Amino acid sequence: MGSKPNAMKNVVAMAAVSALFLLGFLVCSVSGSVSYDSRAITINGKRRILISGSIHYPRSTPEMWPDLIRKAKEGGLDVIQTYVFWNGHEPSPGKYYFEGNYDLVKFVKLVQQSGLYLHLRIGPYVCAEWNFGGFPVWLKYIPGISFRTDNGPFKAQMQRFTTKIVNMMKAERLFESQGGPIILSQIENEYGPMEYELGAPGRSYTNWAAKMAVGLGTGVPWVMCKQDDAPDPIINACNGFYCDYFSPNKAYKPKMWTEAWTGWFTKFGGPVPYRPAEDMAFSVARFIQKGGSFINYYMYHGGTNFGRTAGGPFIATSYDYDAPLDEYGLERQPKWGHLKDLHRAIKLCEPALVSGEPTRMPLGNYQEAHVYKSKSGACSAFLANYNPKSYAKVSFGNNHYNLPPWSISILPDCKNTVYNTARVGAQTSRMKMVRVPVHGGLSWQAYNEDPSTYIDESFTMVGLVEQINTTRDTSDYLWYMTDVKVDANEGFLRNGDLPTLTVLSAGHAMHVFINGQLSGSAYGSLDSPKLTFRKGVNLRAGFNKIAILSIAVGLPNVGPHFETWNAGVLGPVSLNGLNGGRRDLSWQKWTYKVGLKGESLSLHSLSGSSSVEWAEGAFVAQKQPLTWYKTTFSAPAGDSPLAVDMGSMGKGQIWINGQSLGRHWPAYKAVGSCSECSYTGTFREDKCLRNCGEASQRWYHVPRSWLKPSGNLLVVFEEWGGDPNGITLVRREVDSVCADIYEWQSTLVNYQLHASGKVNKPLHPKAHLQCGPGQKITTVKFASFGTPEGTCGSYRQGSCHAHHSYDAFNKLCVGQNWCSVTVAPEMFGGDPCPNVMKKLAVEAVCA
């Protein structure tokens, strides 16, 4: 995944590759059970329309994986796609880690056990809004290295790790050619735009990477995404919000979409993006309509950036991504259900879709049909209305069809509509965070960091140092400390005009302490990580200690020349307003300390937390910077996902039983425009936004599997100052459920009943409502059959309303976990307005 959706898409085509390289392709294609042709990926000789979804194993827990995979399969997926995260698997050179939520083999085997395929994106560059793009930071310090180009040291390391992963998969017989689930692999990632910048070295590197990958003999095809000149036999694939315009670079390669972006990432300081289900479905249907055969949702489950894995910088801890399965693993409705219905409709068309290319038929200025036919007589059609503002009535095959704005109707038999991308049959679930009562409340203890105690663990040198090279990314924190002598005759001591301290930093945030007191803070943003602190500071006669806590908020994950990236206070650092004018502090002696004292003592762990004396009760200070807080609690009953509400805190990090939930920063409020958003029209990452003026992220996921029945240790490090008494444990659950369905809305169930011959008359659709596990429908908040207006949570009656609209739901739904009601006039006391297109809107409360 790249952070720049509009990067250049067209790259100069490459020259032909060697005969040996082509021979590798021929061996793979002929002998392997997975191959491809111009139309699709073929498995055991059979063309397949494949629906895939990204689930990144480190962004959830092993205990969550089976349920996530099950829900993905239930949602209609054929394939799970994941990156491989090099920095998680090789944290230091030659020291590998494949345990816990980095147990890649276990994850792949769970996918296999579910009956799904897997697309393994080895990279090993992943971008993914992941720290340093997935590269281990130690790569920076290999002599002569230059990342992602024709560079010997880099290529040697890349080949070594890629070979390690491939051999691991082979040893477990996990490639499809061995009977395993892996049907595709990916080498590199979104390299095309960078290759264009680099020129010849970039093209040489692309050719080398492709040849190296194919030479590993996996027996399955390799993919490169956003790589228009991917050498044969590599398939070049598309990433984006829409990919219907895309064509592979050779006529004998299939049209693949490796990243269909289901939403966008959240950044600290930014609103929360979302993508309407109708537009997501529209983009996928349009891709399939125009010849696409493989589509992967990025993300299908986004999950959580635990620990310090978030990149960016400034990527939030939540990687929810508005995915069909939310950060906690719950179905996001209606997106999950609407896409499930889409996948079922596409699969009904598969016999015709895989038979060849479509015939295009214009139906109007903004309307067209794409028709697929097979030699055996199968016929499927996609009717599209690209007008974002108005309905269209079109004629096709001697029938008339009404197409909503910006929508596509799917006709598996070239006659009957079973699905329209703008007509949502799935329920909408409104979620809430409910405070979990903790017996006796959370009783906090506190320990305050003191920069003056760092001398024994520090080093001193003249001038300013770069942060990443100094910390080696072992901590977010680096102290810059120096002394400033102020003469007693300085004018500001008498007139009260404070001297101004100016500190320039390459990123990402800083807190400035003068003589042990917090003087102020400054921070950048994802779009502008560099920052300047400029403020009047309270100095006294004699020696003054300036201590700057420089903070990294995730290392960048996208861009060229990783080896050159920097962070921290690079200067200049200066004082203005002294008798002598400006005093440059940059080249005097500075003392440095990597990390916090609390980190070196492991205060976040069960054992380390007992190594210092903690303040209790009335001695626990509020709004105090550089403070560690700890408390214990018992695990709440039930299975509902849990989170901590950090709304009362500023910025820092959180741990549960020694495991990091990630960075918290609720004090960074979201800046943006959260106006009403329509599903119609071209989507972009800033089109649909929530949370403007509020915390970018308030709640932080607590995996249930990290908890013990009692005595769970919660530790918070707070940089700015907050009120720990405002921290609460919450559970995520369904608040209310809604359905919004037209009287004659097409459904797959009704189509299949007709096709089976079990019924021979038109059938009305049904409204389905279901609360969460353990919940029941308690009340019907709103119900109207007629012309209701508004959206879920804010419905209102229109000019036409059936007065008995509530009756069926009160009778069939109240007291039940789930229910279904036929959307027909007789269910609501008769037709309230004949000759008017009616619909049902209902909202029911769950508890």
UniProtKB/Swiss-Prot annotation:
Keywords linked to the UniProt accession: Apoplast, Glycoprotein, Glycosidase, Hydrolase, Secreted, Signal
One GO BP annotation of this record: carbohydrate metabolic process
One Gene Ontology CC term in the entry: apoplast
Residues modified by glycosylation: N469
Signal peptide start-end: 1-32
PROSITE patterns: GLYCOSYL_HYDROL_F35 (PS01182), PEROXIDASE_1 (PS00435), SUEL_LECTIN (PS50228)
InterPro entries, alphabetized: BetaGal_gal-bd, Galactose-bd-like_sf, GHD, Gly_Hdrlase_35_cat, Glyco_hydro_35_CS, Glycoside_Hdrlase_35, Glycoside_hydrolase_SF, Lectin_gal-bd_dom
A UniProt-annotated Pfam family: BetaGal_gal-bd
SUEL-type lectin domain span: 761-847
Keyword Glycoprotein: yes
Molecular function via GO: beta-galactosidase activity; carbohydrate binding
EC number, UniProt record: 3.2.1.23
Catalytic activity: Hydrolysis of terminal non-reducing beta-D-galactose residues in beta-D-galactosides
Residues forming the catalytic site: E190, E259
Compartmental location: Secreted, Extracellular space, Apoplast
Domain of life (superkingdom): Eukaryota
Top enzyme class: hydrolase
Tissue specificity as recorded in UniProt: Ubiquitous, at low levels.
Keyword Glycoprotein part of the UniProt annotation: yes
Family note: Belongs to the glycosyl hydrolase 35 family.
Protein name per Swiss-Prot or TrEMBL: Beta-galactosidase 1
